[in-house]
Amino acid sequence: MTKKKISIIGAGNTGATLAFIVAQHELADVVLIDRPDNEGQVKGKALDIFESSPVYGFDAKVTGSVNYADTADSDIVVITAGSPRKPGMSRDDLVQINEKVMFDVTKEIVKYSPDCKIIVLTNPVDAMTYSVLKASGFPKERVIGQSGVLDTARYQSFIAEALNVSIKDIRGLVLGGHGDTMVPLVNSTNVNGVPLHQLLNQTQIEQIVERTRKGGAEIVALLGNGSAYYAPASAVFEMIEAILKDQHRLLPSIALLEGEYGFSDICLGVPTVLSEKGIENIVELALSDNEQAQLRISADSVEEVKQALKNQ
């Protein structure tokens, strides 16, 4: 069987961490790409990961490069490149800076890997996913944004912490835009089948929801310089694994909506089934009136950022 190939654009903390996780699990060979002025950094990080292979016992190949030709025939390309989020900076502030990065990177991806799936991480990720989709000309199932897996992981971890129970027993989903208007689906959240509202009071639940919405900003403030990368990289790994192994996982992803949930021509976080096709299908849940109203607010917020894109 031909070994799979994953290319990661951007060798910052998230990109390098993702490369390490993918290699460690022998999911695919990895090509880590960065700008020419970062050639030493990207090659050094790739070499460092390779030198850990005897310890972990993996045979995946990890290559650091500044040449997009090395990404040729990738099965999946992950975009992490872009301006980082800084303290006090909203994701929306990044839209003008990162749209051009998405355009330039996408043209290289299409040139060398015309049949790949693209996963976008660059913030503001809902708008950047839309930008990449338009720039690529790919069918909508092959361009996917990452936010929901990460936001859901944060939501679940905060619940497990509050209840002092195993993270393995927490079930829940977070939909909507990747920002302050995201929508944790509290009504369907449960702990091994027990509804969350039977275990926590309304005030406790609201505190967890608010902390989830501010999860990225909390880490940015604590770090002082930079943003989260362990959890984001882990979230992308889960998506990559679902696609490469054709697992048909139901995971929240950013997808282009064409009438689902009442929205069109917008990329938004919704429940999706991920398979070797990319997005196999979008799952439409029966939301409560309050959840649907919150999702509308979130979609409006994403649309506002999308309107700032120069190429819609």
Curated annotation (Swiss-Prot):
UniProt keyword Lyase, yes or no: no
Domain of life: Bacteria
Pfam family, one: Ldh_1_C
Keyword field contains Oxidoreductase: yes
Single GO MF annotation: L-lactate dehydrogenase activity
Binding site for NAD(+): G10, A11, G12, N13, T14, G15, D34, N98, L121, T122, N123
UniProt-listed InterPro entries: L-lactate/malate_DH, Lactate/malate_DH_C, Lactate/malate_DH_N, Lactate_DH/Glyco_Ohase_4_C, Malate_DH_type3, NAD(P)-bd_dom_sf
Entry's Gene Ontology BP terms: lactate metabolic process; tricarboxylic acid cycle
Keywords noted in UniProt: NAD, Oxidoreductase, Tricarboxylic acid cycle
Record's catalysed reaction(s): (S)-malate + NAD(+) = oxaloacetate + NADH + H(+)
Residues that, per the record, bind substrate: R85, R91, N123, R154
Active-site residues (renumbered): H178
E.C. designation(s): 1.1.1.37
Membership in a protein family: Belongs to the LDH/MDH superfamily. MDH type 3 family.
Function description: Catalyzes the reversible oxidation of malate to oxaloacetate.
NCBIfam families: MalateDH_bact, PRK06223.1
Protein name from the UniProt record: Malate dehydrogenase
Species this chain originates from: Staphylococcus saprophyticus subsp. saprophyticus (strain ATCC 15305 / DSM 20229 / NCIMB 8711 / NCTC 7292 / S-41)
Gene name of the encoded protein: mdh
